[in-house]
């Protein structure tokens, strides 16, 4: 029984007289003792879990019985585990909690996980296929059947393929959240039609990591680190936020220290031992200063550097007159980075000399347990931002913390690649609308330039699918997207696959309701820590019915309305395109047991799970097959504590037919490197052409960028005097501060009314995620505004107070927002968070009314647009009584509409930071006002295009380096010009 303190004499008398109640009596003897409570239900209870209804307490204890069905959260990219509580009486989802068996999230979720129930019950969600009526974008819609939509879409695709217009069929996705199914579809169609959002997200960082190792993402082992360097806000909102935050906290609890590099005092920075609010765009210089200290104080792992870097190649080509030894290489490094002293970094970056030196020493002293991560942040913000991740990884190479316990590993070591049934072969197509010749090194598709390419007449789209993708609101230059989405001569048919209306779906021809995270099947796997796991996202109501013995063959039978799921939709569409199999498409979507029937999701995932290492044995131990095991538990850990994969010795079978080059020591099979011989043993190495970590990149010379062969510092577009890609390894500190932004340190211009700042527009809020959180009432009650963060010293020059209106003027327009005066931002920098500023017009269907404002949109002529907020979020009538309780009236400002595109000429990453003018709002300005000139945005696109060095200029016969990975990789023949 729970502990109850003994009563004193006076209290006993009071109880006896009835003055106070006798709480010794157990009013609910059926309730368990406190000692028996657990944070989670045991998996043995998941089929029939009893819980008392909180809504009826304390009047009575009403027992509810649930089936707990595991699935995967889809409210960010972390893939955390969820348990859906399916009410056995009503067959509805009551709530979502964490899945304690999930290796990444371990039963813990952020606010976004439980808020999945809000999305399921959203009164504005789309429950049936909708087709446009009237002009595209005017707001007219009618309900149609799935059969009608499939027939229309399939007919257009069939015609496009028959007429060899393969590049006109495109699938454009934001967050896929799944592994492999859409690749199957597009390859079966024979199109190079995959487009993604990665070049507005993470391509900058990916490119820098890839140059080093051939792997484009890091996998930090935070829990075992001694020192963590974060160029992010990972305790609250960064990539793989929840799993990473847990392990950062564990590392700190074990004694690790952490430094955060960020102009903004994030919650993560507030918890760190060191906050380094650098001048935006100078982060690479700071990292090279750390390297300078580590080199000069000999805080290096000499053996690792000698064994695993391509120092011999670098010395032979660039320093042939120097000693061709590792000591000669280290001496050369000291000379190369000699000017990046702590004093230089202090002057350039605006941080203290002592802090630079102290953090550098802590990195060096941590050695193999130095851990770091960057994903967006500075790498996504600036021209040359890819050098930030490259310089960051340089610190790992110097300290030998690559692939070590407590260090940082390549992501692919901890991410499972599924073996899938009957995969189609790669296509021979190359879509230059996605991979243009101007950007041969772009790490992902140049997706944010699609409207500009269409306007230039580079091509057209006949069938354009958008999925988990809202570029009108999420991307820069959203009005240019509206212009091309409305134009049927540029986009013939736009199909929006979405559970909810959004700013891009308003300009579609079909809006087809796809299932939310708990309403569809997906296989997920992410590099959340030093282990490898898979998780099964499944439609929980369908699975609950199946477990109860009901026959369900189509997810629409269990989902709300006629909401479908992608897998079944794509299978049906492929059969509609190729009903008799004559096009060679249908065969990839036929049942393996009966070719006259479509492939089922059960068959697809059964094959995938049958081939997961160790899963069959784990399932057999419980007398289950692998699919049943995954349905029951939702997750499986394949490997734990995976380190040092580059040292793996290759087997005789792996080396069958291999030859060893006597000079490079590369082991190759049919000309393809498979490993490297070191000290007489052939081991795996890394995925670079040399199989070593490439400090020196011959690729950069081969593709026309010889000034960037080694880690360096490129002047950001925020700070540059002229449009250039000048490296900074040869620029002295006395020429650091450009005149373009000399207002950034509090030096007012002659016109006090209008000042130039750096706008930081990309930071996330812990409670929101892109478009998806707009329909979650709990999340929007927590976070509704995205004010302008401005330092107290900057605000004082205008006597600005929190809540005052300010106008932010970009190169193509302006927006009006409210100020938040704070010391949590570096002077000379203003910041505005992502996620907010959702909008709809009166003519549009009700959409995300928990978060969106009603606006008017005017075309003023000559490419000029104006958006005015008419009213913010307000109460509305629905089946959810909370919709009448909305108390907030500000939905934020859609700042991205006012940003021109800034494509980095090398990585292809959109450089998010903006050089803006800030001033108090004029008397006619209103919060939420947006004015944009798309003619000017097109001119800026061309200015940035002129920075590129297109493939023909380099003398290359290839479109792209063959060793660079890319999504939906075509045949090698397609790479050739």
Give residue ranges: language-model regions:
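Short conserved beta-strand and strand-loop elements enriched in small hydrophobics
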Residues: 802-813
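N-terminal export/assembly segments and adjacent metallocofactor-ligating motifs
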Residues: 1-299, 465-467, 511, 517, ...
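Short, solvent-exposed secondary-structure boundary/capping segments
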Residues: 823-836
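Long, C-terminal catalytic modules of enzymes
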Residues: 539-636, 865-889
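Extended redox/cofactor-interaction regions of prokaryotic respiratory oxidoreductases
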Residues: 182-248, 254-259, 285, 392-510, ...
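Surface-exposed intrinsically disordered loops and tails
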Residues: 546-560, 587-598, 648-674, 726, ...
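Glycine-rich phosphate/diphosphate-binding loops that line cofactor/substrate pockets in enzymes
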Residues: 150-168, 218-227, 336, 357-372, ...
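Long, well-ordered, tryptophan-enriched scaffold segments
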Residues: 255, 259, 264-367
């Amino acid at each position: 029984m729970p502990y109850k303190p003994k009563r004193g004499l006076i209290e006993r008398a009071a109880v006896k007289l009835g003055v106070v109640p006798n709480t010794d009596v157990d009013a609910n003897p059926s309730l368990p003792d406190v000692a028996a409570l657990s944070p989670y239900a045991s998996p043995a209870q998941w089929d029939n879990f009893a819980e008392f209804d909180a809504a009826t307490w304390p009047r009575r204890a009403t027992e509810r019985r649930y089936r707990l069905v595991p699935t995967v959260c889809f409210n960010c990219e972390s893939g955390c585990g969820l348990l859906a509580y399916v009410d056995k009486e009503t067959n509805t989802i009551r709530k979502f909690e964490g899945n304690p068996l999930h290796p990444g999230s371990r039963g813990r979720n952020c606010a976004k996980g439980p808020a999945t129930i809000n999305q399921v019950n959203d009164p504005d969600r789309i429950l049936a296929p909708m087709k446009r009526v009237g002009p595209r974008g005017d707001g007219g819609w009618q309900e149609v059947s799935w059969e009608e939509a499939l027939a229309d879409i399939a007919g257009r695709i069939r015609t496009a393929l028959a007429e060899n217009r393969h590049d006109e069929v495109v699938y454009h996705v934001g967050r896929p959240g799944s592994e492999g199914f859409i690749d199957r579809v597009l390859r079966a169609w024979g199109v190079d039609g995959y487009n993604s959002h990665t070049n507005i997200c993470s391509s900058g960082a990916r490119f820098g990591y890839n140059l080093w190792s051939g792997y484009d993402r890091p996998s930090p082992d935070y829990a075992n680190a001694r020192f963590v360097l974060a160029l992010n806000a990972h305790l609250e909102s960064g990539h793989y936020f929840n799993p990473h935050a847990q392990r950062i906290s564990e590392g700190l609890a074990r004694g690790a220290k952490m430094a955060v590099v960020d102009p903004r005092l994030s919650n993560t920075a507030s918890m760190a031992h060191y906050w380094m609010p650098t001048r935006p765009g100078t982060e690479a210089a700071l990292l090279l200063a750390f390297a300078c200290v580590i080199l000069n104080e000999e805080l290096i792992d000499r053996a690792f550097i000698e064994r695993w870097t391509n120092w011999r190649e670098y010395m032979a080509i660039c320093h042939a007159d120097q000693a061709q030894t590792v000591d000669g290489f280290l001496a050369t490094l000291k000379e190369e980075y000699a000017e990046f002293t702590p004093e230089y970094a202090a002057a350039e970056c605006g941080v203290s000399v002592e802090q630079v030196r102290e953090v550098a020493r802590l990195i060096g002293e941590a050695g193999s347990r130095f851990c770091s991560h960057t994903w967006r942040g500075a790498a996504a913000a600036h021209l040359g931002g890819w050098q930030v991740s490259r310089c960051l990884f340089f610190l790992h190479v110097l300290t030998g913390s690559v692939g070590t316990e407590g260090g940082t590993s390549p992501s692919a070591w901890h991410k499972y690649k599924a073996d899938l049934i009957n995969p189609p072969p790669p296509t021979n197509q190359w879509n230059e609308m996605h991979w243009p010749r101007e950007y041969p090194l772009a790490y992902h598709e140049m997706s944010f330039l699609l409207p500009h390419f269409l306007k230039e007449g580079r091509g057209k789209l006949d069938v354009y699918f958008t999925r988990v993708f809202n570029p009108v609101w999420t991307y820069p230059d959203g009005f240019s997207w509206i212009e091309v989405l409305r134009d049927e001569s540029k986009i013939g048919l736009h199909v929006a696959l979405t559970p909810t209306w959004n700013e891009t779906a308003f300009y579609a021809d079909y809006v087809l309701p796809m299932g939310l995270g708990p309403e569809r099947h997906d296989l997920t796997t992410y590099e959340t820590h030093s282990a490898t796991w898979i998780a099964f996202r499944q439609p929980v109501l369908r699975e609950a019915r199946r477990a109860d013995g009901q026959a369900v063959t189509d997810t629409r039978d269990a989902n709300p309305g006629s909401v479908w799921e992608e897998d079944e939709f794509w299978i049906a569409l492929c059969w509609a395109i190729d009903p008799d199999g004559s096009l060679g498409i249908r065969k990839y979507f036929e049942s393996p047991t009966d070719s006259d029937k479509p492939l089922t999701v059960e068959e697809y995932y059964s094959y995938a799970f049958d081939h997961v290492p160790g899963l069959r044995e784990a399932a057999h131990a419980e007398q289950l097959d692998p699919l049943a095991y995954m349905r029951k538990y939702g997750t499986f850990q394949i490997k734990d504590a995976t380190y040092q994969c580059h040292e793996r010795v290759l087997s005789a079978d792996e080396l069958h037919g291999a030859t060893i080059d006597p000079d490079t020591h590369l082991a190759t099979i049919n000309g393809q490197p498979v490993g490297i011989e070191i000290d007489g043993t052939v081991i795996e190495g890394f995925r670079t052409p040399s199989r070593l970590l490439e400090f020196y990149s011959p690729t950069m010379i081969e593709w026309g960028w010889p000034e960037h062969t080694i880690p360096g510092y490129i002047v950001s577009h925020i700070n540059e005097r002229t449009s250039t890609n000048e490296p900074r390894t040869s620029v002295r500190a006395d020429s650091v501060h450009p005149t373009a932004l000399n207002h950034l340190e509090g030096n007012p211009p002659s016109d006090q009314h209008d000042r130039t700042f750096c706008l930081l527009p990309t930071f996330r809020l812990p409670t929101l995620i892109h478009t998806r959180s707009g329909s979650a009432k709990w999340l929007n009650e927590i976070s509704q505004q995205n004010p302008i963060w401005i330092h107290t010293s900057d605000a004082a020059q205008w006597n600005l107070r929190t809540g005052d209106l300010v106008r932010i003027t970009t190169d193509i327009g302006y927006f009006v927002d409210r100020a938040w005066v704070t010391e949590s931002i570096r002077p000379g920098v203003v910041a505005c968070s992502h996620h907010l500023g959702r909008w709809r017009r009166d003519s549009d269907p009700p959409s995300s009314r928990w978060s969106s404002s009603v606006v008017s949109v005017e075309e003023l002529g000559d490419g000029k647009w104006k958006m005015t907020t008419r009213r913010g979020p307000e109460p509305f009538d629905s089946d959810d009584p909370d919709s009448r309780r909305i108390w907030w009236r500000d939905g934020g400002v859609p700042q991205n509409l006012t940003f021109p595109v800034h494509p980095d000429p090398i990585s292809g990453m959109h450089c998010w930071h903006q050089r803006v003018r800030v001033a108090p709002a004029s008397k006619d300005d209103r919060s939420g006002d947006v004015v944009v000139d798309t003619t000017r945005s097109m001119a800026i696109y061309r200015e940035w295009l002129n920075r590129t060095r297109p493939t023909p200029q380099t003398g290359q016969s290839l479109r792209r380096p063959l060793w660079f990975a890319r999504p939906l990789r075509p045949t090698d023949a397609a790479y050739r010009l």
